[in-house]
Amino acid sequence: MEVLMAERANLVFHNKAIDGTAMKRLISRLIEHFGMAYTSHILDQVKTLGFQQATATSISLGIDDLLTIPSKGWLVQDAEQQSLILEKHHHYGNVHAVEKLRQSIEIWYATSEYLRQEMNPNFRMTDPFNPVHIMSFSGARGNASQVHQLVGMRGLMSDPQGQMIDLPIQSNLREGLSLTEYIISCYGARKGVVDTAVRTSDAGYLTRRLVEVVQHIVVRRTDCGTARGISVSPRNGIMPERIFSQTLIGRVLADDIYMGSRCIATRNQAIGIGLVNRFITFRAQPISIRTPFTCRSTSWICRLCYGRSPTHGDLVELGEAVGIIAGQSIGEPGTQLTLRTFHTGGVFTGGTAEHVRAPSNGKIKFNEDLVHPTRTRHGHPAFLCSIDLYVTIESEDILHNVNIPPKSLLLVQNDQYVESEQVIAEIRAGISTLNFKEKVRKHIYSDSDGEMHWSTDVYHAPEFTYGNVHLLPKTSHLWILLGGPCRSSLVYLSIHKDQDQMNAHSLSGKRRYTSNLSVTNDQARQKLFSSDFYGQKEDRIPDYSDLNRIICTGQYNLVYSPILHGNSDLLSKRRRNKFIIPLHSIQELENELMPCSGISIEIPVNGIFRRNSILAYFDDPRYRRKSSGIIKYGTIETHSVIKKEDLIEYRGVKEFRPKYQMKVDRFFFIPEEVHILPGSSSIMVRNNSIVGVDTQITLNLRSRVGGLVRVERKKKRIELKIFSGDIHFPGETDKISRHTGVLIPPGTGKRNSKEYKKVKNWIYVQRITPSKKRFFVLVRPVVTYEITDGINLGTLFPPDPLQERDNVQLRIVNYILYGNGKPIRGISDTSIQLVRTCLVLNWNQDKKSSSCEEARASFVEIRTNGLIRHFLRINLVKSPISYIGKRNDPSGSGLLSDNGSDCTNINPFSAIYSYPKAKIQQSLNQPQGTIHTLLNRNKECQSLIILSAANCSRMEPFKDVKYHSVIKESIKKDPLIPIRNSLGPLGTCLPIENFYSSYHLITHNQILVTKYLQLDNLKQTFQVIKLKYYLMDENGKIFNPDPCRNIILNPVNLNWSFLHHNYCAETSKIISLGQFICENVCIAENGPPLKSGQFILVQVDSIVIRSAKPYLATPGATVHGHYGETLNQGNTLVTFIYEKSISDDITQGLPKVEQVLEVRSIDSISMNLEKRVESWNKCIPRILGIPWGFLIGAELTIAQSRISLVNKIQQVYRSQGVQIHNRHIEIIVRQITSKVLISEDGMSNVFSPGELIGLLRAERMGRALEEAICYRVVLLGITRASLNTQSFISEASFQETARVLAKAALRGRIDWLKGLKENVVLGGVIPVGTGFKGLVHPSKQHNNIPLETKKTNLFEGEMRDILFHHRKLFDSCLSKKFHDIPEQSFIGFNDS
């Protein structure tokens, strides 16, 4: 029997390895030839054979079988190299964070993929019978990517949100993962424990909703008689053959198919494999097939529109519940997919672009007007072409033309030489397709503390007009200038020009105090707590006990941001030869006027500081008393520091005050009330009497405290003191009473015959003898002050990167202003400062040359885009400089302009020095502490940054500077005046030797230059003096000419330019103060690469740069924070918004299917669809007029959206290798899209506006009533669709039972019990299955009606088909229509 059958089918002898696909083909052919039963019998034998063979070969898998790929090492190394270069570019500010992320992901993805491709050949060559190899390529469950993870590299993973982690897992599972890699792979999709559980339930719920939508769809008829179909065409090559054949097999043709005049397939014929192959070979015209979309029935489906049953390969039987099958076949892979095999990390499967490569070597030419420059996704420069671009490549003997489609990126420049197969252009992937894209925000955080600048204008974001969020209009850099904030009210310096008078309008606000800083040796974390300075009594004194820790080491620098209250006038007093710029301010709190602390900067008139001079001082409000009293030191060693200039004026009373430098931490103040009265005044109290508070003492004085009165009469005045305190009459046993003027620490017993007390605070005991026999002891309260020792700020400056030996240091020193036991007298209610905190300037002494005796201070202004920064520079000056010439400028101000500009004139400019070259090198010292104030835009809150050497880097670009020895003869009397007069107030010339110790910016006002220089005059002057001059203009540009170059003043742009006699092209680079420069930019021809930063100091042979970190930002990014604002580490700088294609991994896939099916508008995905539907809805009725418009508009909209929905869902499943037949998805999509929303335009009598009804029902009602019903198509999600069925019982059993039932009762709805669920709920017979035919009673009427409808509908369907398929015809119809229809008919339609 078997032999006969085999002969009859003449089976082909196969001698090939059979994998999964071959097996599928074999089975389908067996079924075709022999039917189901016989096939299953054959397959059993195949199974047994397989098991026998497997047992015989006994394949086992051991860890030794996992062979790693030899090329892995250098591949990974190569990728690491690439990402290192990328990191560098990011550091230099060439690439921003998003581009860096994208590029690093692509680098690693490519590496991982390449390794995966290497794997198979490697196995095949080394060990073809390796069990791993056999298993992975057997076509059974499991694929290459799993093996790839075992022997290749694990690759990139995605985090729980589906974002890529840009740190790849470089090891494979054979080598074992490191701890970090292990943790990362715990995240990965579906491998995590969390993931599996959650996703399964999601898939289950999806199935439930799907079934709910389509449960009533059953095959009820053989043919619905539709003439429509959907055309599928193999010709245009869009659809791969595999998908094409999958789409066709099992369908039914809707039209005859002709090859020329010969009909090769007829209407209603089922398509099998043979027919499909014939179509593919003949490349016939588009094939029209019937789908569930075209079926004419509302609540069921016919056999021909559904096609073959997937189970047994024949047309589907009547009574088959195809709806439920469809719902389950879509939902079920969801449950599998969650638990499916690993994936490569959900990498952008849609993101890679196609490349255009050069056909041969040669030079490339294209029209540059058609392209404009842009950046690629990875931050590389490229050209974007907006229209088709023809690129010619000229090789030696031949011209190649390459056509580049629009919207592509050209990666080469014009006239560039390209090699064969080099990538010259990148075609953007799938702009037209509806790609799954989502908008992602990425925040960039600051890496270090500093001050923010940016290099272009920014817009305010419209929603935050007054906020600190700005939009960038073009690509630019953001700069963070280093210098960390350490806010404290300890010291704060205001820096202004000398002898200026100005108002400081200052911001009021809470002060912040620094408390208990925990300092680790290298880094300090500050805990700042904000306390109200004048709050309750306990908080009145902020805690400075840890002062010595405020100055942190390492990368932290001091910033003082004081807060001044109200207006304070700044008046600098001149004291001997120093200028003091005091800052006092009045604070109004609870209507009390309390003087607030001020900081004054002291700068000598000539700007020269000696060693240990005081740069600034700060009067701490805690050491300020209003009452008089006596200061007592405990066990304090002090050094009297007396300087002549410390003569302090208090409202006309002069007082000479020495200073005592403190070594120990506490002193005591004993308060007393003192009145100094003229000798003639009458006193109303007696000596040694005891008075209460507010007792009248003289005619116009009352006592402020109660206590003992002492009256002393001096020559011309009377001193009246009131001591507060307890009076104690001692017994004879009391030892304390022997002493007078003793301080008693707390805790000592005070013994008395009657009482025994502990003393809580320090007290001061004073013995008073009013008469010879009696005496008593006055116990007076004492105010204790704790002082921390002065700290050395040397730790602020780490080992010096600028290779300078002399470091300027700032120390904080506390001085007590009064000696031990000195009485302190307050003069007419002024407050008395007991301790002054000073910043003392010092510098290291070199053992070899302790020559550096003085430092010069100068002010520098640096402008950055209109924001002015003042720097106080302190430079060391070597002393053995012999001053020869005197000032030979009669005006006494060197080369300064005559108009009294506000430059700080610190040193005699035209002094001529003479010393050998080596000394010059030494004397060009860097400022080690450059102090820098911050001013807001509105010049309000001032604060101070000290830039240490760690924040600056030094570069010496001017290597070729020649030093000229000064010729002492031939100095004319006033050689420089002609230059100054001819320059006008524009610039100054500085002699080069002196340039390091002072330079500054000239006035910022606009000046018209009228006089031109007489070149010969100038030349002569230069040659006579033989000095090298620098010229600066108002922009702060600095030029460095050769001594014998000519100077030409260009009055147009007010810049100096220097030219050789022979106008040689060699000009020195121009560096302006305040300019930003990126790392890796060379300034000098052979100069070393710089660190990124801002120039704050330009010298003869070197530049000092304040380090800064550039961040690149692209247009559309939002910048947080204000220009010039001080930021802390970790603050948000920029937010990028970029589009990324969602990784096509099934963990994201399921939600994606769900989003499409639910038509959610949260996401940009379905937004596209919704928008499309809207636009189709609007434009078609506008073109066609009302009744036709709605009919055709709805039809077209529905057809379009249906097709795109199906394609989308299939895309997700196919990307996971899941095969689902289109018709299942079609059945569900048909249910989602078959409803229309009645609109209010034409009020119909049948439906109320806003009602959801089926499209076919609306059309039928319109035909029956012969009036236009206005409606528009809506996309319902599956949940809404299942709540909008015809059966309320089915709805109620799904969700919201009470609401649905109540509504149905109120409306009086009728349930016709057509679906399965209603019948199941009520326990009836369900209308499906093979016995279904018996339920439908054939009747005469029933037979007649379909024929008539069939005819009319055929015509109508054809009409629709014409309109639907032939767009050209359609357009011409429209235009004709427009001409034909008169306006009245339009109005008529509107009325109806």
Swiss-Prot record:
Catalytic activity from the UniProt record: RNA(n) + a ribonucleoside 5'-triphosphate = RNA(n+1) + diphosphate
Biological process according to GO: DNA-templated transcription
Top-level taxon of origin: Eukaryota
Gene Ontology molecular function, alphabetical: DNA binding; DNA-directed RNA polymerase activity; zinc ion binding
Binding site for Zn(2+): C224, C295, C302, C305
Annotated Gene Ontology cellular component terms: chloroplast; DNA-directed RNA polymerase complex; mitochondrion
Location within or outside the cell: Plastid, Chloroplast
UniProt cofactor(s): Zn(2+)
Keywords: Chloroplast, DNA-directed RNA polymerase, Metal-binding, Nucleotidyltransferase, Plastid, Transcription, Transferase, Zinc
Record keyword Lipoprotein present: no
Co-factor binding details: Binds 1 Zn(2+) ion per subunit.
Subunit structure: In plastids the minimal PEP RNA polymerase catalytic core is composed of four subunits: alpha, beta, beta', and beta''. When a (nuclear-encoded) sigma factor is associated with the core the holoenzyme is formed, which can initiate transcription.
Primary role: DNA-dependent RNA polymerase catalyzes the transcription of DNA into RNA using the four ribonucleoside triphosphates as substrates.
Family of this protein: Belongs to the RNA polymerase beta' chain family. RpoC2 subfamily.
Protein name: DNA-directed RNA polymerase subunit beta''
Species annotation: Solanum tuberosum (Potato)
